[in-house]
Design a protein with these regions (language model features):
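P-loop NTPase motor module signature
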Residues: 1-382, 389
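Acidic, serine/threonine- and proline-rich low-complexity intrinsically disordered segments
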Residues: 302, 307-314, 318-321, 327-329, ...
Length: 471
């Protein structure tokens, strides 16, 4: 949001203080925002920027912001006891389920938080935990298993804040326990009261862009030590807790990275480059990315570009403004965390192909319009071209659908029925279904039964229609 405001208000004059929280996550937007704010600070001495994080690389950020003062706020965490496995676990999902059952059987009262990588794993684990504990009968207290992942409807996400179930036999019975099984959104985005035990398999899904085949993938990857510390900290919010790491202590110390790999190093940069061009930043080499070159490296780039060095043929075929991107191949080892040169090259090529940039790397008229849409460049170009083919309403619906998660619901106990319902749709049916469903909403106020019979998420269907279409 702040990046988009900067397009119309480059000095961010509406704000006197800007706070950036969870800076250690190094999201794509955060790294770009750091560069913009550093530039704004040179022009607005009244602006204050506060960078907050629980696991921040303080020295790196201080150096970036020219020796900014550092304030440490003492934490209020209770002690957390860490347990490691003796040997690596072959199947971390089964190990997590086994550990949860052991905690419920043997440990004092307190809720459990399990970190897994995605929806399918989480739903599978929920079913197995319920079944395993249910088979134990009255020997243990009741359990409430709650999933948490991004595509879960909001009302179901709120269940993580429910209390643990009461004992079966009144106050004298064995107390119940809540088990929350979540993706890494529970690391920092929210705090769940009552969590005493954390189970950490050491993995998370990360979006990775392959510039050679121009495809983004969600890959299961080891977490960083910083993320592991964050996960363990979830157990010590209200009282002393325990964290069960399903990997060896040696793996924690030797195999895990210190910090999470910055998103700018593994993302498609098409939207970022388009935004920077709209902000008037034409020289991407000199843009002060949070993860960019030191001053000496920039001087070397200037010397190279202004010298008479013989250039490779493929450089000569490129517009001169694109040469710096290829130079990054030579100076990458000297940089801190530079954006991948091939990824930037692909972003510039894509924007040029879509007509957003001309052959000299300048923003075109259609590129200016595209930058106004908070969409991937391909989708923005599709929206801009739709009036020419008189299909704007349909393109708006399709674009909305491509900008939110998968609409299809596939309950584990009804997978066959869900697959059969999905097979009845053609490509054109979903936009028509979305549009016609809103007619039913206006007439009957509810359409839950209709969409659920087709195994489509009602709340995601709501997101597919633009506000204008819902009025």
């Amino acid at each position: 949001m702040l990046l988009r405001e900067a397009m119309t208000d480059p000095l961010l004059e509406r704000y006197g203080v800007i706070i950036i929280d969870e800076a250690h996550e190094r999201t794509l937007a955060t790294d770009v925002l750091f560069g913009l704010l550093k530039e704004v600070l040179t022009k607005r001495i009244d602006l204050k920027v506060v960078v907050m994080s629980a696991t921040l690389e303080a020295e790196k950020f201080q150096n970036y912001f020219l020796e900014a003062p550092l304030m440490r706020v003492p934490g209020r965490l209770y002690p957390v006891e860490i347990f490691y496995t003796q040997n690596p676990e072959r199947d971390y999902l089964e190990a997590a389920i086994r550990t949860a059952v052991q905690i419920h059987s043997c440990e004092p009262p307190g809720d459990v938080l399990i970190f897994l990588t995605g929806e399918e794993e989480i739903e599978d684990a929920c079913m197995k935990v319920r079944r395993e504990i249910g088979n134990m009968g009255d020997r243990v207290g009741p359990v409430k298993v709650v999933p948490l992942y991004a595509s879960l409807p909001p009302q179901q996400q709120q269940r993580i804040f429910d209390d643990a179930p009461p004992p079966r036999d009144g106050s004298s019975g064995v107390p119940g326990r809540k088990v929350v099984i979540s993706t890494n959104i529970a690391e920092t985005s929210l705090t769940i009261d009552g969590i005493v035990y954390v189970i950490d398999p050491g993995f998370a899904k990360q979006k990775v862009y392959n510039p050679r085949i121009r495809v983004e993938s969600l890959l299961v990857s080891p977490i960083s030590r910083a993320s592991a510390h964050q996960r363990a900290g979830r157990a010590g919010r209200t009282r002393p807790g325990k964290c069960f790491r399903l990997y060896t202590e040696s793996s924690f110390k030797k195999d895990l990275q210190e910090q999470t790999y910055p998103e700018i190093l593994r993302s498609n940069l098409g939207s970022v480059v388009l935004q920077l061009k709209k902000l008037g930043i034409d020289d991407l080499v000199h843009f002060d990315f949070m993860a960019c070159f030191s001053h000496s490296i920039v001087q070397e780039i200037d010397f190279f570009l202004n010298s008479n060095t013989t250039l490779p043929l493929k450089w000569i075929l490129l517009p001169k403004k694109l040469w710096p991107v290829h130079f990054w191949h030579f100076c990458g080892p000297y940089a801190k965390d530079p954006p991948a040169p091939e990824t930037l090259m692909r972003a510039l090529e894509l924007l040029n192909y879509l007509g957003a940039l001309d052959d000299d790397g300048n923003l075109t008229q259609i590129g200016t319009v595209m930058s106004d849409f908070p969409l991937d460049p391909q989708l923005a170009k599709m929206v801009c071209a739709s009036p020419q083919f008189r299909c704007s309403n349909e393109i708006f619906t399709i674009t909305s659908m491509l900008s939110v998660p998968n609409p299809f619901i596939r309950p584990r106990d009804q997978q066959g029925e869900a697959d059969e319902a999905k097979s009845r749709f053609s490509h054109i049916d979903i936009p028509n279904f979305s549009r016609n469903s809103w007619v039913l909403v206006k007439k009957h106020c509810r359409f839950d039964e209709l969409v659920l019979s087709c195994y489509i998420s009602p709340w995601l269907l709501y997101l597919y229609k633009s506000p204008a279409a819902r009025n």
